[in-house]
């Protein structure tokens, strides 16, 4: 991973002040997606890191995790599994709830998407509190999958999600770190 590549990716991510509410500095990965060179560099970095680890599935969380997880899965030659909000998946699912700052949310996965012994890489765009990936990890493990790695484009380390996920036994990797919330 070169400093030049990281700089390209980092500079393609726009920061939006006071979105979605006052006091939040939002890191917008859609601007990265608009830059084909930065988007490809992001996928290439993830492929280089994970290509020889023997994963059998990549799981992406709704919704921006799909944008990085699906192309990564294709490049790794493995299946992609979406984890979605309730009612969005047509086959039988299991669900896992998790706490938000003000309330509770739930994620679902198809019951047949992960089989016993699958070696799973979890991917999302941004790591803040870690609640989404904790719930995703619990779903995968409930189905018998082995998950030890989680990859992100962005980490906000001040919020502490990386420590939370490390407490679950996950190796956390992020391409870029940004200060703030």
Curated annotation (Swiss-Prot):
The keyword Protein transport appears for this protein: no
The intrachain disulfides are: none
Question: What is this enzyme's class at the first EC digit?
Answer: transferase
Q: Which residues form a coiled coil?
A: none
Name a single GO cellular component: cytoplasm
EC annotation from Swiss-Prot or TrEMBL? 2.4.2.7
State the superkingdom.
Bacteria
Subcellular localization: Cytoplasm
Provide the catalytic activity annotation.
AMP + diphosphate = 5-phospho-alpha-D-ribose 1-diphosphate + adenine
Keyword annotations for this protein? Answer: Cytoplasm, Glycosyltransferase, Purine salvage, Transferase
| Segment forming the signal sequence | none
**GO BP annotations listed:** adenine salvage; AMP salvage; purine ribonucleoside salvage
Q: Which GO terms describe its molecular function?
A: adenine binding; adenine phosphoribosyltransferase activity; AMP binding
The pathway it acts in is: Purine metabolism; AMP biosynthesis via salvage pathway; AMP from adenine: step 1/1
List the InterPro entries hit by this protein, alphabetically. Answer: Ade_phspho_trans, PRibTrfase_dom, PRTase-like, UPRTase/APRTase
- Is Plastid set as a keyword in this record? no
Its quaternary structure?
Homodimer.
Q: What does this protein do?
A: Catalyzes a salvage reaction resulting in the formation of AMP, that is energically less costly than de novo synthesis.
The family this protein is said to belong to: Belongs to the purine/pyrimidine phosphoribosyltransferase family.
Identification of the protein by name? Adenine phosphoribosyltransferase
Q: Which organism is it from?
A: Vibrio campbellii (strain ATCC BAA-1116)
**Organism phylogeny:** Bacteria, Pseudomonadati, Pseudomonadota, Gammaproteobacteria, Vibrionales
């Amino acid at each position: 991973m070169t400093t030049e590549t990281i700089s390209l990716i980092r500079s393609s991510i726009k920061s939006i002040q006071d979105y979605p509410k006052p006091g939040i500095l939002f890191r917008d990965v859609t601007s990265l997606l608009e830059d084909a060179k930065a988007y490809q560099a992001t996928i290439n970095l993830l492929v280089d890191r994970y290509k020889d680890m023997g994963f059998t599935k990549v799981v992406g969380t709704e919704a921006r995790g799909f944008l990085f997880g699906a192309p990564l899965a294709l490049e790794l030659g493995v299946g992609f599994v979406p984890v979605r909000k309730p009612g969005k998946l047509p086959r039988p699912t299991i669900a896992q709830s998790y706490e938000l700052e003000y309330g509770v949310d739930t994620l679902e996965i198809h019951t047949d998407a992960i089989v016993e012994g699958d070696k799973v890489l979890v991917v999302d765009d941004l790591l803040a509190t870690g609640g989404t990936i904790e719930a995703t990890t619990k779903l995968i493990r409930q189905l018998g999958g082995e998950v030890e790695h989680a990859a992100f484009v962005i980490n906000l380390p001040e919020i502490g999600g990386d420590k939370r996920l490390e407490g679950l036994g996950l190796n956390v990797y992020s391409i870029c770190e940004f200060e703030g919330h």
